[in-house]
């Protein structure tokens, strides 16, 4: 039911194209995955999302458990029917949100107790419960519960959290019993190569349908992000889809693809869109600026998204300056289409044996010149 098929390899780097087969369709990789935290990509309908070429989206277990609750989603027929999305869905376990958003009361090997950020009530999440929630949600891919410490934590604290992540992974595997849902483990270890290698090898030993690398782009220096991207893949299985969590810039995506990563997600396209900022090549255009008031060109004349085909920068500037919701939605839609188009072009370049020339991260000028 779940299969990852590698369809081509770059002769000079670790980049590859592939097809990840799921019960709700296939995902052509490399691929960017829009974030729909609460079973919605903010301001964008499922029909619009399909028009961008999106093939898989991410929703969040932590947030959906708190509101509206997994039992309601299950009663609706599962998350696909609940949000009217016919393609694959991956649910993040919520580990990052628990440790970054909630006021923690207690962390133990059994799980985490915290205050609900919505109403202050006490909530307890264990690895077993997190898996059961995701089984009720009915996503195609469930993520193991992990402990993601702050990037400022010292090596001893990160090692302690890593042992907890590994213990929880074992419990997640033992609890997960849904044949039509894949379980991915998550590699942690912070900026420490020894811990990253240890975690990659341990997580890989479970032979799960896919594997993710977490604890990246959580406030650390860019050099540390690149170090993890360059180092960890050599310890991951080749025949599994590799998911790099929380990455959405062109440079980091191209670097990650060069090192053999396949799937990416990031909130930036919609977060920036809601503030009036649009992606253009490897730049960001703040459409709130006065210089766009009389600019009747689209955000990107080479982009085929609904926004660029139908609306000018001047109109979007007008919407943003007047706090019109439509403007935020249209820019977010373009930003998602931009990243989908970028990963699609990377796939074409890999198949045509020109990835190194066109998209390798050290060739930043080729990205800036918009070869895709």
Curated annotation (Swiss-Prot):
Catalytic reactions of this protein: 7-aminomethyl-7-carbaguanine + guanosine(34) in tRNA = 7-aminomethyl-7-carbaguanosine(34) in tRNA + guanine
BP terms from Gene Ontology: queuosine biosynthetic process; tRNA wobble guanine modification; tRNA-guanine transglycosylation
Binding site for substrate: 92-96, 146, 188, 215
Enzyme Commission code: 2.4.2.29
Active site: 92 (proton acceptor), 265 (nucleophile)
KW Transferase (keyword) present: yes
Top-level enzyme category: transferase
Binding residues annotated for Zn(2+), in chain numbering: 303, 305, 308, 334
Protein purpose: Catalyzes the base-exchange of a guanine (G) residue with the queuine precursor 7-aminomethyl-7-deazaguanine (PreQ1) at position 34 (anticodon wobble position) in tRNAs with GU(N) anticodons (tRNA-Asp, -Asn, -His and -Tyr). Catalysis occurs through a double-displacement mechanism. The nucleophile active site attacks the C1' of nucleotide 34 to detach the guanine base from the RNA, forming a covalent enzyme-RNA intermediate. The proton acceptor active site deprotonates the incoming PreQ1, allowing a nucleophilic attack on the C1' of the ribose to form the product.
Listed HAMAP family: Q_tRNA_Tgt (MF_00168)
Protein name in the entry: Queuine tRNA-ribosyltransferase
Species, as recorded: Prochlorococcus marinus (strain MIT 9301)
Taxonomic placement: Bacteria, Bacillati, Cyanobacteriota, Cyanophyceae, Synechococcales
Gene behind this protein: tgt
């Amino acid at each position: 039911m779940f299969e990852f098929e590698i369809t081509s390899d770059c002769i000079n780097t670790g980049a590859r194209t592939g097809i990840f087969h799921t019960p709700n369709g296939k995902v052509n990789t490399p691929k960017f995955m829009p974030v729909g935290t609460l079973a919605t990509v903010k301001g964008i309908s499922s029909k619009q999302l399909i028009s961008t070429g999106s093939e898989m989206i991410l929703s969040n277990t932590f947030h959906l458990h708190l509101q509206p609750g997994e039992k309601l989603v299950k009663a609706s027929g599962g998350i696909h029917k609940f949000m009217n999305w016919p393609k694959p869905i991956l649910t993040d376990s919520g580990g990052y949100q628990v440790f970054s958003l909630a006021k923690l009361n207690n962390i133990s090997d059994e799980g985490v107790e915290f205050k609900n950020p919505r109403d202050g009530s006490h909530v307890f999440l264990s690895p077993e419960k997190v898996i059961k929630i995701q089984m009720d949600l009915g996503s195609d891919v469930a993520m193991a519960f992990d402990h993601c410490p702050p990037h400022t934590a010292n090596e001893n604290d990160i090692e302690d959290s890593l042992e907890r992540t590994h213990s929880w992974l074992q419990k997640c595997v033992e609890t997960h019993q849904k044949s039509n849902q894949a379980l991915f483990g998550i590699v942690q270890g912070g900026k420490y190569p020894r811990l990253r290698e240890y975690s990659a090898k341990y997580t890989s030993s479970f032979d799960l349908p896919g594997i993710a690398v977490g604890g990246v782009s959580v406030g650390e220096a860019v050099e540390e992000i690149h170090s993890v991207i360059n180092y960890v893949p050599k310890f991951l299985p080749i025949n599994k889809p590799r998911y790099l969590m929380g990455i959405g810039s062109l440079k980091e995506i191209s670097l990650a693809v060069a090192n053999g990563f396949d799937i990416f997600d990031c909130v930036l396209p919609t977060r920036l869109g809601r503030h009036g900022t649009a992606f253009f090549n490897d730049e960001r255009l703040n459409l709130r600026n006065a210089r766009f008031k009389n600019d009747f060109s689209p955000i990107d004349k080479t982009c085929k998204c609904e926004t660029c085909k139908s609306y000018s920068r001047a109109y979007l500037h007008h919407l943003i300056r007047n706090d019109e919701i439509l403007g935020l939605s249209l820019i977010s839609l373009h930003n998602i289409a931009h990243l989908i188009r970028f990963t699609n072009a990377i796939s074409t370049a890999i198949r045509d044996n020109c990835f190194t020339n066109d998209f390798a991260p050290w060739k930043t000028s080729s990205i800036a010149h918009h070869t895709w």
